Structure formats: structure tokens, C-alpha cells
Amino acid sequence: MCLSNVYLDEKKQDKLVIEEASQVIVDDANVHVQTIFGESKNLEGYYVSEVNLMENYVILRKK
């Protein structure tokens, strides 16, 4: 199973939004992130800047 950590702006521990995200949904103005354990966060005004599937992380940035 490939789960990814989600960060704001850069891959640093203090920028970590959610660990082991199983789903990232993007709509016009929001990014919704959810784990397999049901934890979720909705980030308004962000976009997906980078997805690294080899290192299992996602970077979000403010629009």
C-alpha cells in the first residue's frame, strides 16, 4: 500500500499536515486529504504543487 505524507510549502517535519494520506481530492478552491483511519483535513485556497511517488509525499502551496 502506498500512503503519502502531505506537507505545506516544503518537505519539513514542522510543515507536515497529515501523515499516511490515502486520498487527496482537489476541487476548484480546496484540497481534501484523508487517511485510511478516517482522519481528514480540508485545506481551502491550496493547490497540489508536487507529488513524489517514489518518496511518498505531496507538497501543497497556497494559491
Go through each PLM region and give its residues.
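Compact, glycine-rich, soluble single-domain proteins
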Residues: 2-63
